[in-house]
């Protein structure tokens, strides 16, 4: 049997009746001879194997993806775009979050060349380096997260010839400073809670929902790099305090106690922070049950508010709001991580995770920039303020979580 006929049979387009027994069809005009392909045009898409049409991936499959949506392809494109075009000058916590995602992608894909370029870009910012003055100085949660990059470098190079102890020293100094009394000349007053009210919390605690990624990741990375339990214990204690303060009965989080709106990216920061925390927190840790409870409550809420397009909105509980890519990528990361670890029921949550990843990749343009990203946003007690936020392309607030979601799909963990 000819291969073409077999393919059509598999696809259900021909019956299995022998050709001799079929009723003869009227002769059809033969197509004209095709011209040679134009070398100036992109190659025509090669059809996928017939079995893909017959046996498509299940709704919850997290391994087989449409053309152009694989985590390897998306992750590589965004990591390369970051190091070649977006990392020229340090620009704060969105850059740190993207750097972390790119380093993790390089580690998981064994891309040593990419890893070394990411490290080389940070090296001038070490003490005494040509760009050391670009390191932030404020005692503020949005600045202290810079310590994540040297800590991640220490983690991914541990035991390798390229390991440099300076990265661990610099990273842990930021993590230690986050719990030390603030230096007045380097303090951003709005972010610092009076020390006598802290009850073991960081002086940088301000009870904005965003903090639960910024603060969480610095302490987690310090623990991952050193194994020192103090970083993990105080981090988990902090997260429980934020859960008690900001999570609502519906599972979502207010931007701040005095701003009662469920802002997409704000909730995304918390979702991603909880997923990262639960990846590391031991099963017997006294705060794990409370954090897992808060995480599951939020994931259940996200199922309710996910749009038919796979996305979440700028204000999560307002379907009339615009689909926002950075929050959707963060929720995708949190869902993927929960399904792969078994914290979430795969039958219920994996389809939502798959839809969200495919939807988010559709917002990556031909230049590898993520589109429809909410601009940097402080808190304000106004619904219209959030609905009217500027939508940006290539903003690192969006590049970073798409990298995290790609990394989550590539991780082999449960």
What are these regions (language model features)?
Residues 22, 86, 182-183, 247, ...:
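Glutamine-centric residue-chemistry signal
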Residues 115-116, 125-256, 367:
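Extended ligand-binding groove/face enriched in aromatic
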Residues 19-23, 29:
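Boundary at the C-terminal end of the N-terminal hydrophobic targeting segment
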Residues 162, 166, 206-315, 321-332, ...:
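Extended ligand-binding clefts on enzyme/binding-domain cores
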Residues 1-4:
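Positively charged n-region of N-terminal signal peptides that target proteins for export
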Residues 71, 91-102, 106, 139-154, ...:
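Aromatic-lined, polymer-binding surfaces characteristic
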Residues 6-16:
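Bacterial N-terminal signal peptides
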Residues 36-96, 105-147, 153-170, 186-189, ...:
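CBM-like carbohydrate-recognition segments
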């Amino acid at each position: 049997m000819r291969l073409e006929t077999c393919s059509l049979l598999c696809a259900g387009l021909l019956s299995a009746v022998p050709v001799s027994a079929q009723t003869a069809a009227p002769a059809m005009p033969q197509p004209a001879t095709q011209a040679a392909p134009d070398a100036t045009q992109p190659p025509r898409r090669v059809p996928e194997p017939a079995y893909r049409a017959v046996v498509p991936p299940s709704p919850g499959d997290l391994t087989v993806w449409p053309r152009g949506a694989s985590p390897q392809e998306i992750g590589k494109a965004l990591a390369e775009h970051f190091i070649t075009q977006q990392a020229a000058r340090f620009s704060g916590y969105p850059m740190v979050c993207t750097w972390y995602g790119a380093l993790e992608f390089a580690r998981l894909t064994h891309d040593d060349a990419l890893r070394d370029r990411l490290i080389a870009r940070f090296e001038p910012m070490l003490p005494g380096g040509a760009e050391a003055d670009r390191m932030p100085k404020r005692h503020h949660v949005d600045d202290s997260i810079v310590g994540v990059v040297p800590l991640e470098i220490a983690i991914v190079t541990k035991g390798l010839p390229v390991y440099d102890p300076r990265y661990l020293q610099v990273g842990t100094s930021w993590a230690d400073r986050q719990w030390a009394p603030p230096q007045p000349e380097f303090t951003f007053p709005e972010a610092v809670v009076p020390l006598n009210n802290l009850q073991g919390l960081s002086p940088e605690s301000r009870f904005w929902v965003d903090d639960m990624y910024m603060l969480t990741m610095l302490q987690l990375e310090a623990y991952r790099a050193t194994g020192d339990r103090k970083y993990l214990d105080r981090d988990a204690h902090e997260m429980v305090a934020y859960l008690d303060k900001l999570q609502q009965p519906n599972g979502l989080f207010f931007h701040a106690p005095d701003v009662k709106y469920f802002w997409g990216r704000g909730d995304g920061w918390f979702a991603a922070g909880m997923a990262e925390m639960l990846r590391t927190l031991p099963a017997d840790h006294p705060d794990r049950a409370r954090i897992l409870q808060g995480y599951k409550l939020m994931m259940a809420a996200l199922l309710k508010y996910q749009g038919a397009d796979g996305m979440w909105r700028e204000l999560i509980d307002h379907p009339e709001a615009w689909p926002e890519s950075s929050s959707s990528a963060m929720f995708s990361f949190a869902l993927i991580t929960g399904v792969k670890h078994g914290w979430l029921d795969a039958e219920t949550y994996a389809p939502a995770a798959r839809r969200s990843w495919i939807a988010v990749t559709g917002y990556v343009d031909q230049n590898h920039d993520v589109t429809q990203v909410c601009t940097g946003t402080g808190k304000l007690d106004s619904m219209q303020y959030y609905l009217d936020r500027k939508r940006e392309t290539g903003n690192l607030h969006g590049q970073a979580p798409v990298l995290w979601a790609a990394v989550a799909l590539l991780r082999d963990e449960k």
